[in-house]
């Protein structure tokens, strides 16, 4: 089953697990609030100016997918916690998994395209292909967004087919969730259909993301070394700008890596579902998810300006 480790079968009664689930829900609320602010801030600018820069349009798309994804995941967490013995392919969880599969794939692709955009626009490479992409990439943005939605929809349908077939097999054979025959059929489908599909779906955008991030961080590192030779140190405004950009990129990369690892660990069954280690790992992942929107708010000049205007309006200053 896809989506926040939806294989069930044991109840969560441990007090530590309950505390971690509570922390997890709070972190998700923070992530929802942060992404919601990003959507609202850039959405207002879009309405006022009737346009958005390509980078901002990608940020809105990423923020919207994360906002919806966190909301769906929160619903799944509550459902799993309240119904730990529910069959993992019942209609409710299939509906939630359908949303999760689409939003998860869209989030991965939007994050990847944002890294591509940063790499092409910021990195200082002189290769002809790289320079050609600098001029063409912004015009491709609508097609990039549509292709991301299309790929996400296609893989979501493939996931739904596998999930629905297992549920139909369960109904035909009147199997119980803990039935040995039912579990063997489910394990076969998960191992030879869902798992390869997951790896292909998640690895493609991740590979592109890593390549772009390595190129971009390498370019910024070289530029910082050159700047150090011509400036008085790290207190120079230009150097501080490079450091902030590098830290923002590293935080983005850490979030993406941690999220990708959580997906792989889930698919491989490294952390048993509803086990204490499972909730610890989830808390770490969503701590990153909650922190990254905050980093974006302070690293993006437009978002930072909106945040300052909100503070000044609260204080009653012009």
From Swiss-Prot:
Pfam families per the UniProt record, alphabetical: TAS2R
Keyword Cytoplasm found: no
Regions of this protein lying in the Extracellular compartment: 1-7, 62-88, 150-183, 256-264
KW Nucleotide-binding (keyword) present: no
CDD domains: 7tm_TAS2R41-like (cd15018)
InterPro entries associated with the record: TAS2R
Family matches, as Gene3D superfamilies: Rhodopsin 7-helix transmembrane proteins (1.20.1070.10)
Molecular function, one GO term: G protein-coupled receptor activity
Keywords: G-protein coupled receptor, Glycoprotein, Membrane, Receptor, Sensory transduction, Taste, Transducer, Transmembrane, Transmembrane helix
Mode of membrane association: Multi-pass membrane protein
Protein name per Swiss-Prot or TrEMBL: Taste receptor type 2 member 60
Organism in which the protein naturally occurs: Gorilla gorilla gorilla
């Amino acid at each position: 089953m896809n989506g926040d480790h939806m294989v069930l079968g044991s109840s969560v009664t441990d007090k530590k697990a309950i505390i971690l689930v509570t922390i997890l829900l709070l972190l998700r609320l923070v992530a929802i609030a942060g992404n919601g602010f990003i959507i609202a801030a850039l959405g207002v600018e879009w309405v006022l100016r009737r346009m958005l820069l390509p980078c901002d349009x990608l940020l809105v798309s990423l923020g919207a997918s994360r906002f919806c994804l966190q909301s769906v995941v929160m619903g799944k967490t509550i459902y799993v916690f309240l119904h730990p013995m529910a069959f993992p392919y019942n209609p409710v969880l299939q509906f939630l998994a359908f949303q999760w599969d689409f939003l998860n794939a869209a989030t991965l692709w939007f994050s990847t395209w944002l890294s591509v955009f940063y790499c092409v626009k910021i990195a200082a490479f002189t290769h002809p292909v790289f320079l050609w992409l600098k001029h063409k990439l912004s015009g491709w943005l609508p097609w990039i967004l549509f292709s991301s939605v299309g790929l996400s929809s296609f893989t979501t349908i493939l996931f739904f087919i596998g999930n629905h077939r297992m549920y139909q097999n369960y109904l035909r054979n009147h199997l119980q969730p803990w039935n040995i025959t039912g579990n063997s059929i489910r394990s076969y489908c998960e191992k030879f259909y869902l798992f390869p599909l997951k790896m292909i779906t998640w690895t493609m955008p991740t590979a592109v993301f890593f390549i772009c991030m390595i190129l971009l961080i390498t370019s910024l590192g070289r530029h910082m070394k050159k700047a150090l030779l011509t400036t008085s140190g790290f207190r120079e405004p230009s150097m501080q700008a490079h450091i902030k950009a590098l830290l923002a990129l590293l935080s983005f990369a850490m979030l993406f890596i941690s999220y990708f690892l959580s997906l792989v660990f889930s698919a491989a069954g490294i952390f048993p579902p509803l086990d204490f280690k499972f909730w610890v790992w989830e808390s770490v992942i969503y701590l990153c998810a909650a922190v990254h929107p905050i980093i974006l708010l302070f690293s993006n000049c437009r978002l930072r300006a909106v945040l300052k205007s909100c503070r000044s309006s609260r204080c009653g200053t012009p």
